[in-house]
Amino acid sequence: MYGETGTGTWYPHQFGGECVDGRKALPDLTTATLDKLDWTPVLEVEVPGIEVSPQMCEPNRIQEIIRPKEIKQIGDSIWLVDMGKALNGWVELSFPKLPEGHRVRMEYTDWLNENEDFKPQEENGQYEDWYIGSGQGKEVFRNKFNHHAFQYIRISGLAKAPEEVTGYLIHTDYKDASSFECSDPDLNAIYAMIKYTFKNLAFSGYIVDCPHYERMGYGGDGNASCKSFQTLYEGSSVYMNWMQMWQDCIREDGGMPHCVPNPYPAGGGPYWCGFIITGSWQTYLNYGDSRLIERYYPVMRHWLRYVDAYTVAGLLKRWPDTDYRAWYLGDWLAPAGVDYTAQSSVDLVSNCFISDCLTTMEKLSLIHISEPTRQAEIS
């Protein structure tokens, strides 16, 4: 039932969408129906030098059903749907009868412009789905192989308003672990905002930087958000899965990417790579789960040997860009007036972090290895 378009790539603003052709919709998924189809042979592809582990945490599941706040017509056969709040997930739309072959376009965005008109998420981005009418009565579109982060939907090519619009908030099926309420409504709102934000970011077994632009599991974001997420949610299995992805991505020489999954050379620095250490330690502190330490301690040591190779007179210096990693950042969000690109600033921040990593490794060694072995490592 899928049309001629692909589903995009894993590059910023290029995640694409789905083109569903109602004319190809199957009446059912029984063996008899499926056997009548002309199936394309399965292709086996060998990708050398890449480790890929199965996702070892809860799957993504629908967590909340969201109804639109408003549906209004903004042009000839054009409708604007306001879901009332942002969400990361799927949309389902029921259309009145469409002519066979008629195309309906759905575009997604987080915001409106100053005139409260639809503002594209990115001028050259791909954030849209298409539905092609079957001409057979009531038509229904629902995402199956892609997802979007949005609050607003612009529907074009529809003479009448959609009969029904439903949003599905989706995230990894981790459980709630916190509650908070006080007499200050602002603090209550901040707590609710942070908690809901994570529901849109913790997706597919790791935490993304943004669910629309990049969908990348940056180690820097992981470090910055770890304590908050692990306080709010029971996420030990999410971090186990995420740390396994870091192990899969470490190179033979001990070099680490700045994010996992690692589809292209993304930006970062030591604070990003060292998440394998700090994330494992924080998971132990929050959940008492020592499995990450036991499993990934050798990976941490391997990376620190890579750090040592670029250490001069006791201080880490810039390592080179590679085909899997770019830039060399220190404080990515420095206060106004601080030149975060200055090498002195980058070196200061990076070496402070490495110092913290080494201190943490000493604590990890108390848990993971015997005292004689630990003393031998220290000496």
Q: Where are these predicted regions, by residue range?
A:
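Extracellular/oxidizing-compartment recognition motifs
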Residues: M1-P211, S237-M240, P257-P261, R291, ...
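Aromatic-rich carbohydrate-recognition surfaces in CAZymes
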Residues: Y131-A161, D186-I190, F198-F203, R215-S365
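Intrinsically disordered, low-complexity segments enriched in Ser/Pro/Gly/Ala and basic residues
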Residues: I155, I378-S379
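Single conserved hydrophobic/aromatic residue that forms the stacking wall/gate
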Residues: I367-I378
